[in-house]
């Protein structure tokens, strides 16, 4: 039934995480839920980190909205499909319960099967992008005592009715998450394709260029380490994450957060900070953007 964490001293904010069934783990990163019980008129604020795609349903009455880059969603869709993101989003909510299924790039290719770059840094009505499936999956989740069981059943059935994804997607995912990988030319060589073909593959299935995704992974590693410490002096943590120049980290803070790290640390983000801990406990990694590639891959080079 997963694990739950309380995110506020008064117990009004909570999150839940569960693993998908093993045969779905290459496609689904996690199942999670966010609940807030706030007095009428009170609005909470939080952070949506840069991530892969996800499908999110608001159950019952409630309110949530978000700002993602220059786009403002107020209110957000009740049945929402979040495309892969390169910007942190800043959410607001009243009382609500949202349940989610995170999609890896392989899951996007297998189940959604659309050009991810067209949905990058966007939140859309899931029914418009995933017609038929969004409504059916919502109905299954609403009826279930255990959302994870409903998600597992639906995606297992969908797995039997969809074509296998290209093997190159898993190979690229592994390279994008390798902290030692810094050169696109080396990545292209190990993928046995030219850089232009690599760029097209990355945009279609991951939403962005390989260069941006390598920067996103490096930045997420640094940001998570900073949020885990109560002290200043972040230079060593930034270096450990792969930055060799502090100015590059400062630049990436503006790119991925639209603000300095010091300002981001001070923002209210109770659910996000709790999710870093709970996700690591349940799944082994604190953020979806760093969710590991399927095991057993072989990459030449």
Where are these regions (language model features)?
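Amphipathic alpha-helical "recognition" segments
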Residues: 211-216, 222
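Hydrophobic side chains within alpha-helical segments
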Residues: 221, 248-251, 255
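Contiguous, well-ordered alpha-helical segments that form the cores/surfaces of helical PPI scaffolds
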Residues: 200, 220-224
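HTH DNA-binding helix-turn interface
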Residues: 201-210, 253-261
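Alpha-helical bundle regulatory/interaction domains
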Residues: 1-195, 208-210, 224-228, 233-244, ...
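Residue-level "edge-of-site" marker
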Residues: 201, 216, 251, 267
């Amino acid at each position: 039934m997963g694990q739950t964490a309380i995110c506020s001293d008064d117990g009004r904010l909570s999150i839940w995480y569960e693993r998908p069934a093993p045969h779905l783990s290459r496609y689904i990163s996690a199942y999670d839920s966010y609940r807030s019980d706030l007095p009428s008129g009170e609005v909470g604020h939080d952070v949506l980190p840069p991530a892969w795609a996800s499908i999110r349903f608001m159950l019952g009455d409630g309110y949530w909205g978000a700002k993602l880059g220059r786009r403002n969603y107020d209110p957000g869709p009740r049945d929402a499909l979040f495309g892969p993101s390169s910007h942190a989003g800043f959410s607001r909510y009243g009382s609500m319960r949202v349940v989610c299924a995170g999609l890896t790039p392989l899951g996007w290719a297998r189940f959604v099967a659309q050009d991810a770059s067209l949905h990058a840094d966007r939140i859309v009505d899931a029914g418009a992008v995933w017609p038929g499936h969004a409504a059916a999956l919502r109905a299954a989740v609403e009826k279930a005592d255990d959302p994870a069981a409903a998600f597992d059943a639906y995606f297992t059935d969908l797995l039997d009715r969809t074509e296998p994804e290209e093997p190159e997607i898993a190979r690229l995912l592994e390279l994008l998450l390798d902290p030692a990988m810094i050169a696109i030319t080396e990545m292209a060589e190990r993928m046995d394709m030219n850089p232009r073909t690599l760029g097209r593959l990355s945009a279609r299935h991951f939403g962005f260029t390989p260069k941006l995704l390598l920067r996103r992974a490096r930045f997420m590693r640094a940001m998570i380490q900073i949020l885990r410490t109560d002290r200043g002096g972040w230079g060593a943590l930034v270096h450990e994450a792969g930055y060799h120049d502090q100015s590059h980290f400062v630049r990436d803070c503006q790119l991925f957060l639209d603000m300095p790290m010091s300002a981001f640390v001070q923002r209210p983000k109770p659910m996000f900070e709790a999710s870093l801990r709970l996700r690591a406990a349940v799944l082994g990694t604190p953020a979806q953007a760093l969710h590991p590639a399927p095991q057993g891959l072989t990459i030449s080079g």
